């Protein structure tokens, strides 16, 4: 009952709302440090990865980064360390990494890139995510994969989808007019109309 919860200010606020009791707390922010008696934790703000209150914790002396959900996967094998991942399991792991990234981090690509930028000055020997293997190997590779996945490809086709339903045809005319306006402003955009009416 006398522990002190150390977290971002947002996390402390959320936790107070969840547990409905008061507790001792210490809010930490970007670059704050905590002396654990011979070991030092440095905190790195990483909002929306994938919670608004996320912070990374860096164990300075050991060069270990605790990243909450970042660089994680829903993947398990007979060991814990990435260096022990059998070569024949690599494709499964990479699929799991992507399947974890897409729903959790793809909506927050700009935040992923900001977090990666804050890591550029750190020596990291190990990443401990909340899920999946502990990255004691391939650290730079996995970070670069996240960076690649989070970098927008502006050469990709620009597409506008206009779904509509039209009981009497007027909404269809409006949708077609919007399409014409878009193409007039930018002829390099592909515009697709989708009639949502259910045909019997």
Question: Which residues make up each language-model segment?
Answer:
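Active-site metal-binding motif and surrounding structural segment of the metallo-beta-lactamase
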Residues: 1-6
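Catalytic core of the metallo-beta-lactamase
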Residues: 20-87
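Divalent-metal (often Zn2+) His-rich catalytic cores of metallo-beta-lactamase-fold enzymes
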Residues: 60, 64-65, 71-94, 103-156
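Short gly/pro/ser/thr-enriched loop/turn and capping motifs at secondary-structure boundaries
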Residues: 12-15, 73-74
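Short, polar loop motifs at secondary-structure junctions
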Residues: 9-13, 30
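Active-site glycine- and acidic-residue-rich loops that bind
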Residues: 45-55, 102-110, 192
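Short acidic-aromatic active-site loops that bind/stabilize oxyanions
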Residues: 98-109, 164-168
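N-terminal beta1-alpha1-beta2 submodule of the flavodoxin-like/Rossmannoid cofactor-binding fold
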Residues: 138-200
């Amino acid at each position: 009952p006398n522990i002190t919860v150390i977290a971002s200010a947002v996390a402390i606020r959320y936790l107070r709302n969840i547990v409905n009791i008061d507790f001792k707390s210490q809010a930490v922010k970007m670059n704050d440090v905590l002396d654990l008696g011979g070991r030092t934790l440095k905190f790195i703000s990483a909002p929306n990865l994938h919670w608004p209150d996320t912070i990374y914790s860096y164990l300075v002396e050991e060069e270990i980064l605790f990243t909450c959900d970042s660089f994680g996967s829903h993947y398990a094998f007979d060991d814990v360390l990435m260096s022990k991942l059998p070569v024949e399991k690599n494709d499964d792991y990479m699929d799991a990494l992507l399947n974890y990234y897409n729903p959790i981090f793809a909506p927050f690509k700009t935040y992923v890139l900001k977090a990666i930028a804050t890591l550029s000055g750190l020596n990291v020997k190990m990443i401990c995510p909340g899920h999946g293997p502990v990255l004691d190997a391939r650290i730079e590779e996995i970070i670069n994969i996240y960076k690649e996945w989070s970098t927008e490809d502006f050469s990709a086709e620009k597409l506008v989808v206009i779904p509509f339903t039209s009981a009497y045809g007027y909404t269809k005319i409006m949708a077609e007019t919007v399409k014409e306006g878009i193409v007039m402003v930018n002829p390099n955009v592909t515009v697709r109309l989708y009639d949502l009416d259910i045909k019997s």
